[in-house]
Swiss-Prot record:
Site annotation Involved in polymerization: residues: Y448
Stretches for region Disordered: 428-448
SMART domains: Tubulin (SM00864), Tubulin_C (SM00865)
Any one annotated GO CC term: cytoplasm
Subunit field text: Dimer of alpha and beta chains. A typical microtubule is a hollow water-filled tube with an outer diameter of 25 nm and an inner diameter of 15 nM. Alpha-beta heterodimers associate head-to-tail to form protofilaments running lengthwise along the microtubule wall with the beta-tubulin subunit facing the microtubule plus end conferring a structural polarity. Microtubules usually have 13 protofilaments but different protofilament numbers can be found in some organisms and specialized cells.
Record gene name: tba-2
Organism domain of life: Eukaryota
UniProt keyword terms in alphabetical order: Cytoplasm, Cytoskeleton, GTP-binding, Hydrolase, Magnesium, Metal-binding, Microtubule, Nucleotide-binding
Phenotype of gene-disrupted mutants: RNAi-mediated knockdown abolishes recruitment of microtubule end-binding protein EB1/ebp-2 to a wound site. Almost completely abolishes induction of nlp-29 expression upon infection with Drechmeria coniospora, or upon wounding. Severely compromises expression pattern and recruitment of snf-12 upon wounding.
Signal peptide feature range: none
Name by which UniProt lists this protein: Tubulin alpha-2 chain
Naturally occurring in which organism (per UniProt): Caenorhabditis elegans
Protein backbone atom coordinates (compact mmCIF):
# COMPACT_ATOMS: atom_id res chain seq x y z
CA UNK A 1 0.00 0.00 0.00
CA UNK A 2 1.04 3.61 -0.38
CA UNK A 3 0.28 5.01 3.06
CA UNK A 4 0.40 8.65 4.07
CA UNK A 5 0.80 9.88 7.63
CA UNK A 6 -0.89 13.18 8.48
CA UNK A 7 0.69 15.32 11.18
CA UNK A 8 -1.33 18.20 12.60
CA UNK A 9 0.72 20.76 14.49
CA UNK A 10 -0.50 23.62 16.68
CA UNK A 11 -3.98 25.08 16.95
CA UNK A 12 -4.49 25.72 13.24
CA UNK A 13 -3.14 22.31 12.24
CA UNK A 14 -5.26 20.49 14.80
CA UNK A 15 -8.48 22.29 13.92
CA UNK A 16 -7.95 21.76 10.20
CA UNK A 17 -7.18 18.13 11.01
CA UNK A 18 -10.50 17.92 12.77
CA UNK A 19 -12.35 19.19 9.71
CA UNK A 20 -10.39 16.94 7.34
CA UNK A 21 -10.95 13.72 9.23
CA UNK A 22 -14.63 14.55 9.66
CA UNK A 23 -14.85 14.85 5.88
CA UNK A 24 -12.78 11.72 5.18
CA UNK A 25 -15.07 9.72 7.44
CA UNK A 26 -18.14 10.98 5.61
CA UNK A 27 -16.54 10.21 2.25
CA UNK A 28 -15.67 6.65 3.20
CA UNK A 29 -18.75 5.88 5.26
CA UNK A 30 -16.78 5.45 8.46
CA UNK A 31 -18.71 6.15 11.67
CA UNK A 32 -17.38 8.56 14.34
CA UNK A 33 -16.32 5.53 16.39
CA UNK A 34 -14.22 4.14 13.54
CA UNK A 35 -16.53 1.31 12.50
CA UNK A 36 -17.78 0.84 9.00
CA UNK A 37 -21.30 -0.53 8.62
CA UNK A 38 -20.97 -3.93 6.97
CA UNK A 39 -23.04 -3.16 3.87
CA UNK A 40 -20.67 -0.41 2.69
CA UNK A 41 -17.57 -2.53 2.18
CA UNK A 42 -15.29 -0.56 -0.11
CA UNK A 43 -13.98 -2.27 -3.20
CA UNK A 44 -10.33 -1.60 -3.85
CA UNK A 45 -9.67 -0.64 -0.23
CA UNK A 46 -7.82 2.46 -1.37
CA UNK A 47 -8.78 4.37 1.74
CA UNK A 48 -6.38 2.29 3.83
CA UNK A 49 -3.72 4.75 2.66
CA UNK A 50 -5.19 7.07 5.30
CA UNK A 51 -6.84 4.64 7.73
CA UNK A 52 -5.31 1.57 9.30
CA UNK A 53 -7.49 -1.48 9.88
CA UNK A 54 -7.27 -2.88 13.40
CA UNK A 55 -8.55 -6.24 12.25
CA UNK A 56 -11.56 -6.06 14.55
CA UNK A 57 -13.56 -3.96 12.12
CA UNK A 58 -12.31 -0.59 13.31
CA UNK A 59 -10.48 1.94 11.20
CA UNK A 60 -7.99 4.30 12.81
CA UNK A 61 -6.67 7.42 11.05
CA UNK A 62 -2.95 7.37 10.33
CA UNK A 63 -2.54 10.76 11.95
CA UNK A 64 -0.91 12.57 14.83
CA UNK A 65 -2.09 15.70 16.60
CA UNK A 66 0.55 17.76 18.38
CA UNK A 67 0.19 20.97 20.32
CA UNK A 68 2.37 22.46 23.00
CA UNK A 69 -0.70 23.28 25.08
CA UNK A 70 -3.64 20.96 25.72
CA UNK A 71 -6.86 22.97 25.21
CA UNK A 72 -7.32 22.54 21.45
CA UNK A 73 -6.49 18.84 21.39
CA UNK A 74 -8.75 18.35 24.43
CA UNK A 75 -11.66 19.40 22.24
CA UNK A 76 -10.96 16.35 20.07
CA UNK A 77 -10.45 14.16 23.12
CA UNK A 78 -13.96 15.02 24.26
CA UNK A 79 -15.62 15.70 20.88
CA UNK A 80 -17.74 13.66 18.47
CA UNK A 81 -14.74 11.83 17.05
CA UNK A 82 -13.04 10.96 20.34
CA UNK A 83 -13.37 7.22 19.66
CA UNK A 84 -11.96 7.51 16.16
CA UNK A 85 -8.41 8.42 17.17
CA UNK A 86 -6.00 6.35 19.20
CA UNK A 87 -5.35 8.24 22.47
CA UNK A 88 -1.61 7.93 21.85
CA UNK A 89 -2.02 9.94 18.65
CA UNK A 90 -2.89 13.06 20.65
CA UNK A 91 0.28 14.57 22.06
CA UNK A 92 0.14 17.73 24.15
CA UNK A 93 2.56 19.67 26.29
CA UNK A 94 1.85 21.72 29.40
CA UNK A 95 2.81 25.24 28.32
CA UNK A 96 2.23 26.77 24.93
CA UNK A 97 4.70 28.39 22.57
CA UNK A 98 3.19 31.85 23.17
CA UNK A 99 3.38 32.83 19.48
CA UNK A 100 7.13 32.54 19.77
CA UNK A 101 9.01 30.56 17.10
CA UNK A 102 11.98 30.13 19.42
CA UNK A 103 9.81 28.49 22.10
CA UNK A 104 8.32 26.07 19.59
CA UNK A 105 11.66 25.26 18.01
CA UNK A 106 14.11 25.39 20.89
CA UNK A 107 12.84 25.44 24.46
CA UNK A 108 9.34 23.99 24.75
CA UNK A 109 9.43 22.02 21.49
CA UNK A 110 12.62 20.15 22.42
CA UNK A 111 10.80 18.44 25.28
CA UNK A 112 8.07 16.99 23.07
CA UNK A 113 9.91 16.16 19.87
CA UNK A 114 11.15 12.72 20.90
CA UNK A 115 7.70 11.58 22.02
CA UNK A 116 6.27 12.77 18.72
CA UNK A 117 8.94 11.04 16.65
CA UNK A 118 8.38 7.87 18.65
CA UNK A 119 4.65 7.91 17.84
CA UNK A 120 5.41 8.65 14.20
CA UNK A 121 7.83 5.73 14.16
CA UNK A 122 5.04 3.46 15.44
CA UNK A 123 2.65 4.65 12.76
CA UNK A 124 5.37 4.20 10.14
CA UNK A 125 6.12 0.66 11.28
CA UNK A 126 2.45 -0.09 10.80
CA UNK A 127 2.68 0.86 7.10
CA UNK A 128 3.73 -1.59 4.42
CA UNK A 129 4.94 1.09 2.01
CA UNK A 130 4.99 4.52 3.58
CA UNK A 131 4.78 7.13 0.87
CA UNK A 132 5.25 10.29 2.86
CA UNK A 133 3.96 12.84 5.31
CA UNK A 134 1.36 15.54 5.15
CA UNK A 135 2.10 18.28 7.69
CA UNK A 136 -0.61 20.80 8.60
CA UNK A 137 0.35 23.98 10.43
CA UNK A 138 0.15 27.74 10.47
CA UNK A 139 3.03 30.11 9.77
CA UNK A 140 2.07 32.65 12.39
CA UNK A 141 1.77 30.67 15.62
CA UNK A 142 4.66 29.64 17.82
CA UNK A 143 3.95 25.91 17.69
CA UNK A 144 2.90 25.95 14.03
CA UNK A 145 6.08 27.72 12.99
CA UNK A 146 8.71 26.62 15.50
CA UNK A 147 7.72 23.06 16.27
CA UNK A 148 6.90 22.24 12.64
CA UNK A 149 10.32 23.33 11.43
CA UNK A 150 11.98 21.26 14.16
CA UNK A 151 9.84 18.27 13.19
CA UNK A 152 10.60 18.64 9.48
CA UNK A 153 14.33 18.71 10.18
CA UNK A 154 14.05 15.53 12.23
CA UNK A 155 11.83 13.79 9.67
CA UNK A 156 14.45 14.50 7.00
CA UNK A 157 17.01 12.74 9.16
CA UNK A 158 14.83 9.73 10.01
CA UNK A 159 12.95 9.31 6.72
CA UNK A 160 15.27 10.92 4.19
CA UNK A 161 13.68 9.81 0.94
CA UNK A 162 10.01 10.05 1.90
CA UNK A 163 8.15 13.01 0.52
CA UNK A 164 7.00 15.69 2.92
CA UNK A 165 4.12 17.90 1.86
CA UNK A 166 3.04 20.89 3.92
CA UNK A 167 -0.32 22.52 4.18
CA UNK A 168 0.38 25.93 5.67
CA UNK A 169 -1.88 28.72 6.83
CA UNK A 170 -0.27 31.91 5.63
CA UNK A 171 -0.83 35.05 7.74
CA UNK A 172 -3.64 37.04 6.18
CA UNK A 173 -2.66 40.49 4.86
CA UNK A 174 -5.33 42.40 6.81
CA UNK A 175 -6.52 40.07 9.56
CA UNK A 176 -3.73 39.34 12.02
CA UNK A 177 -3.87 37.00 14.99
CA UNK A 178 -0.43 37.91 16.35
CA UNK A 179 1.88 40.88 16.06
CA UNK A 180 4.95 38.71 15.51
CA UNK A 181 3.47 36.67 12.64
CA UNK A 182 5.98 38.05 10.10
CA UNK A 183 8.91 36.91 12.28
CA UNK A 184 7.52 33.42 12.81
CA UNK A 185 6.59 33.00 9.15
CA UNK A 186 9.96 33.99 7.81
CA UNK A 187 11.89 31.94 10.35
CA UNK A 188 9.82 28.82 9.69
CA UNK A 189 9.93 29.22 5.91
CA UNK A 190 13.70 29.56 6.02
CA UNK A 191 14.14 26.48 8.22
CA UNK A 192 11.72 24.20 6.37
CA UNK A 193 12.54 25.35 2.84
CA UNK A 194 15.07 22.60 2.24
CA UNK A 195 13.07 19.92 4.06
CA UNK A 196 9.71 20.34 2.39
CA UNK A 197 8.98 18.93 -1.05
CA UNK A 198 5.84 20.88 -1.71
CA UNK A 199 3.92 23.40 0.39
CA UNK A 200 0.32 24.34 -0.32
CA UNK A 201 -0.47 27.73 1.14
CA UNK A 202 -3.85 28.96 2.27
CA UNK A 203 -4.53 32.37 3.69
CA UNK A 204 -7.43 33.02 6.03
CA UNK A 205 -8.40 36.32 4.50
CA UNK A 206 -8.90 34.78 1.07
CA UNK A 207 -11.18 32.19 2.64
CA UNK A 208 -13.05 34.81 4.69
CA UNK A 209 -13.81 36.53 1.40
CA UNK A 210 -15.02 33.30 -0.18
CA UNK A 211 -17.32 32.74 2.81
CA UNK A 212 -18.77 36.21 2.57
CA UNK A 213 -18.99 36.41 -1.20
CA UNK A 214 -19.93 32.90 -2.25
CA UNK A 215 -21.60 31.41 0.79
CA UNK A 216 -23.31 34.50 2.24
CA UNK A 217 -21.85 33.83 5.67
CA UNK A 218 -21.65 37.27 7.23
CA UNK A 219 -19.33 36.45 10.10
CA UNK A 220 -17.37 33.32 9.25
CA UNK A 221 -16.04 31.24 12.15
CA UNK A 222 -12.98 29.03 12.01
CA UNK A 223 -15.31 26.07 11.49
CA UNK A 224 -16.58 27.66 8.27
CA UNK A 225 -13.03 28.31 7.10
CA UNK A 226 -11.77 24.87 8.01
CA UNK A 227 -14.59 23.14 6.16
CA UNK A 228 -13.58 24.94 3.00
CA UNK A 229 -9.92 24.10 3.57
CA UNK A 230 -10.86 20.47 4.19
CA UNK A 231 -12.54 20.31 0.76
CA UNK A 232 -9.26 21.41 -0.81
CA UNK A 233 -7.25 18.89 1.21
CA UNK A 234 -9.77 16.21 0.37
CA UNK A 235 -9.43 16.94 -3.36
CA UNK A 236 -5.67 16.78 -3.14
CA UNK A 237 -5.77 13.47 -1.30
CA UNK A 238 -8.81 11.97 -3.07
CA UNK A 239 -6.68 10.27 -5.69
CA UNK A 240 -4.80 8.48 -2.92
CA UNK A 241 -8.01 7.36 -1.22
CA UNK A 242 -10.26 6.41 -4.14
CA UNK A 243 -9.75 4.68 -7.45
CA UNK A 244 -10.26 7.01 -10.38
CA UNK A 245 -9.62 7.28 -14.08
CA UNK A 246 -6.55 9.47 -13.80
CA UNK A 247 -5.00 9.01 -10.42
CA UNK A 248 -2.34 11.24 -9.01
CA UNK A 249 0.00 10.06 -6.31
CA UNK A 250 2.03 12.12 -3.83
CA UNK A 251 5.26 12.08 -5.79
CA UNK A 252 3.37 12.94 -8.93
CA UNK A 253 2.38 16.32 -7.48
CA UNK A 254 5.98 17.20 -6.94
CA UNK A 255 7.11 15.93 -10.32
CA UNK A 256 4.52 18.04 -12.08
CA UNK A 257 4.36 21.13 -9.90
CA UNK A 258 7.90 21.78 -8.73
CA UNK A 259 10.28 22.90 -11.50
CA UNK A 260 13.10 23.76 -9.06
CA UNK A 261 13.46 22.50 -5.50
CA UNK A 262 12.96 25.92 -3.91
CA UNK A 263 10.00 26.92 -6.04
CA UNK A 264 7.60 24.59 -4.29
CA UNK A 265 4.69 26.76 -3.19
CA UNK A 266 1.70 26.01 -5.42
CA UNK A 267 -1.38 28.19 -5.21
CA UNK A 268 -4.63 26.34 -4.54
CA UNK A 269 -8.03 27.28 -5.95
CA UNK A 270 -11.26 25.35 -5.55
CA UNK A 271 -14.62 25.64 -7.29
CA UNK A 272 -17.55 25.58 -7.03
CA UNK A 273 -17.93 26.92 -3.52
CA UNK A 274 -21.55 28.02 -3.47
CA UNK A 275 -24.43 27.97 -1.04
CA UNK A 276 -27.35 25.60 -1.57
CA UNK A 277 -29.68 28.44 -2.65
CA UNK A 278 -27.35 29.46 -5.48
CA UNK A 279 -26.49 25.92 -6.58
CA UNK A 280 -30.12 25.31 -7.41
CA UNK A 281 -29.96 27.89 -10.20
CA UNK A 282 -26.57 27.20 -11.72
CA UNK A 283 -25.50 24.60 -14.24
CA UNK A 284 -21.78 24.42 -13.37
CA UNK A 285 -20.48 22.56 -16.39
CA UNK A 286 -16.88 21.36 -16.57
CA UNK A 287 -15.79 24.43 -18.51
CA UNK A 288 -17.56 26.75 -16.02
CA UNK A 289 -15.76 25.35 -13.02
CA UNK A 290 -12.44 25.15 -14.88
CA UNK A 291 -12.64 28.80 -15.89
CA UNK A 292 -13.61 29.98 -12.45
CA UNK A 293 -10.47 28.34 -11.05
CA UNK A 294 -8.45 30.97 -12.83
CA UNK A 295 -10.33 33.82 -11.18
CA UNK A 296 -8.47 35.38 -8.24
CA UNK A 297 -11.76 35.26 -6.29
CA UNK A 298 -11.55 31.49 -5.91
CA UNK A 299 -7.96 31.31 -4.79
CA UNK A 300 -6.79 30.37 -1.35
CA UNK A 301 -4.04 33.02 -1.21
CA UNK A 302 -4.46 36.72 -1.90
CA UNK A 303 -2.36 37.38 -4.97
CA UNK A 304 -3.11 38.13 -8.58
CA UNK A 305 -1.99 35.43 -11.03
CA UNK A 306 -2.77 37.80 -13.89
CA UNK A 307 0.40 39.64 -12.90
CA UNK A 308 2.45 36.46 -12.78
CA UNK A 309 3.19 33.58 -15.08
CA UNK A 310 2.19 29.98 -14.63
CA UNK A 311 4.89 27.35 -14.54
CA UNK A 312 2.62 24.36 -14.10
CA UNK A 313 -1.02 23.67 -13.44
CA UNK A 314 -2.56 20.59 -11.92
CA UNK A 315 -6.32 20.21 -12.23
CA UNK A 316 -7.94 17.68 -9.93
CA UNK A 317 -11.53 16.97 -10.88
CA UNK A 318 -13.99 14.90 -8.96
CA UNK A 319 -17.48 13.70 -9.68
CA UNK A 320 -19.25 13.52 -13.01
CA UNK A 321 -16.41 14.56 -15.33
CA UNK A 322 -15.28 13.02 -18.62
CA UNK A 323 -11.83 13.62 -20.14
CA UNK A 324 -13.32 15.01 -23.36
CA UNK A 325 -14.94 17.95 -21.50
CA UNK A 326 -11.73 18.61 -19.62
CA UNK A 327 -9.71 18.77 -22.83
CA UNK A 328 -12.18 21.21 -24.36
CA UNK A 329 -12.07 23.40 -21.25
CA UNK A 330 -8.26 23.42 -21.18
CA UNK A 331 -8.03 24.19 -24.89
CA UNK A 332 -10.27 27.21 -24.32
CA UNK A 333 -8.08 28.42 -21.47
CA UNK A 334 -4.90 28.13 -23.51
CA UNK A 335 -6.31 30.60 -26.01
CA UNK A 336 -6.90 33.28 -23.36
CA UNK A 337 -4.36 36.06 -23.26
CA UNK A 338 -4.77 36.76 -19.56
CA UNK A 339 -3.42 33.36 -18.60
CA UNK A 340 0.29 33.41 -19.33
CA UNK A 341 2.73 30.55 -19.08
CA UNK A 342 6.48 30.90 -18.75
CA UNK A 343 8.05 30.40 -22.15
CA UNK A 344 10.07 27.37 -21.07
CA UNK A 345 7.01 25.38 -20.05
CA UNK A 346 4.59 25.44 -22.93
CA UNK A 347 2.05 22.74 -22.07
CA UNK A 348 1.85 22.75 -18.33
CA UNK A 349 -1.45 21.01 -17.56
CA UNK A 350 -1.66 17.88 -15.45
CA UNK A 351 -5.11 16.43 -14.95
CA UNK A 352 -6.51 14.06 -12.35
CA UNK A 353 -10.07 12.74 -12.48
CA UNK A 354 -11.85 11.01 -9.67
CA UNK A 355 -15.35 9.64 -10.07
CA UNK A 356 -16.29 10.02 -6.40
CA UNK A 357 -18.50 13.14 -6.24
CA UNK A 358 -17.60 15.81 -3.67
CA UNK A 359 -19.08 15.13 -0.24
CA UNK A 360 -20.30 17.92 2.00
CA UNK A 361 -20.72 18.01 5.75
CA UNK A 362 -24.45 17.85 6.56
CA UNK A 363 -25.68 21.14 7.97
CA UNK A 364 -22.63 22.98 6.61
CA UNK A 365 -22.66 26.00 4.29
CA UNK A 366 -21.61 24.27 1.08
CA UNK A 367 -24.04 22.99 -1.50
CA UNK A 368 -23.89 19.40 -2.70
CA UNK A 369 -22.61 19.60 -6.27
CA UNK A 370 -22.21 16.91 -8.95
CA UNK A 371 -18.65 17.92 -9.85
CA UNK A 372 -15.86 20.05 -8.48
CA UNK A 373 -12.29 20.91 -9.35
CA UNK A 374 -9.28 21.83 -7.30
CA UNK A 375 -6.53 23.62 -9.14
CA UNK A 376 -2.96 23.60 -7.89
CA UNK A 377 -0.84 25.99 -9.86
CA UNK A 378 2.77 26.99 -9.50
CA UNK A 379 2.74 30.64 -10.43
CA UNK A 380 5.25 33.44 -9.98
CA UNK A 381 2.43 35.58 -8.56
CA UNK A 382 2.82 33.92 -5.18
CA UNK A 383 6.00 35.94 -4.79
CA UNK A 384 3.61 38.82 -3.97
CA UNK A 385 2.72 37.00 -0.78
CA UNK A 386 6.37 36.68 0.17
CA UNK A 387 7.21 40.30 -0.53
CA UNK A 388 4.26 41.42 1.60
CA UNK A 389 5.55 39.35 4.46
CA UNK A 390 9.15 40.45 4.00
CA UNK A 391 8.04 44.08 4.07
CA UNK A 392 6.30 43.62 7.42
CA UNK A 393 9.31 41.75 8.77
CA UNK A 394 11.60 44.60 7.75
CA UNK A 395 9.45 47.24 9.43
CA UNK A 396 9.66 45.44 12.77
CA UNK A 397 13.20 44.18 12.49
CA UNK A 398 14.59 47.62 11.63
CA UNK A 399 13.61 48.62 15.16
CA UNK A 400 14.53 45.17 16.57
CA UNK A 401 10.99 45.10 17.98
CA UNK A 402 10.08 41.95 19.96
CA UNK A 403 13.44 40.37 19.12
CA UNK A 404 14.40 39.98 22.79
CA UNK A 405 11.65 37.38 23.28
CA UNK A 406 13.31 35.17 20.69
CA UNK A 407 16.85 35.73 21.89
CA UNK A 408 15.71 35.02 25.44
CA UNK A 409 14.66 31.54 24.35
CA UNK A 410 18.11 30.70 23.03
CA UNK A 411 17.98 31.99 19.49
CA UNK A 412 20.71 34.08 17.99
CA UNK A 413 19.97 37.36 16.29
CA UNK A 414 21.93 36.15 13.29
CA UNK A 415 19.15 33.68 12.54
CA UNK A 416 16.81 36.55 11.75
CA UNK A 417 19.20 38.04 9.21
CA UNK A 418 19.95 34.64 7.74
CA UNK A 419 16.25 33.83 7.36
CA UNK A 420 15.51 37.21 5.84
CA UNK A 421 18.32 36.80 3.31
CA UNK A 422 17.02 33.37 2.38
CA UNK A 423 13.59 34.85 1.65
CA UNK A 424 15.12 37.65 -0.38
CA UNK A 425 16.80 34.92 -2.41
CA UNK A 426 13.46 33.12 -2.76
CA UNK A 427 11.81 36.28 -4.13
CA UNK A 428 14.71 36.62 -6.55
CA UNK A 429 14.31 32.97 -7.60
CA UNK A 430 10.68 33.62 -8.46
CA UNK A 431 11.65 36.71 -10.41
CA UNK A 432 14.24 34.80 -12.44
CA UNK A 433 11.93 31.91 -13.15
CA UNK A 434 9.36 34.32 -14.54
CA UNK A 435 11.85 36.21 -16.70
CA UNK A 436 11.90 35.29 -20.37
CA UNK A 437 14.58 32.75 -21.06
CA UNK A 438 16.06 34.62 -24.03
CA UNK A 439 17.12 37.61 -21.90
CA UNK A 440 20.67 37.38 -20.61
CA UNK A 441 21.61 33.82 -21.47
CA UNK A 442 25.07 34.32 -19.94
CA UNK A 443 24.44 33.97 -16.22
CA UNK A 444 22.18 30.94 -16.44
CA UNK A 445 24.61 28.29 -15.32
CA UNK A 446 25.53 28.92 -11.76
CA UNK A 447 22.10 29.41 -10.15
CA UNK A 448 20.99 25.82 -9.53
Amino acid sequence: MREVISIHVGQAGVQIGNACWELYCLEHGIQPDGTMPTQSTNEGESFTTFFSDTGSGRYVPRSIFVDLEPTVVDEIRTGTYKKLFHPEQMITGKEDAANNYARGHYTVGKELIDTVLDRIRRLADNCSGLQGFFVFHSFGGGTGSGFTSLLMERLSVDYGKKSKLEFSIYPAPQVSTAVVEPYNSILTTHTTLEHSDCAFMVDNEAIYDICRRNLDVERPSYTNLNRIISQVVSSITASLRFDGALNVDLNEFQTNLVPYPRIHFPLAAYTPLISAEKAYHEALSVSDITNSCFEPANQMVKCDPRHGKYMAVCLLYRGDVVPKDVNTAIAAIKTKRTIQFVDWCPTGFKVGINYQPPTVVPGGDLAKVPRAVCMLSNTTAIAEAWSRLDYKFDLMYAKRAFVHWYVGEGMEEGEFTEAREDLAALEKDYEEVGADSNEGGEEEGEEY
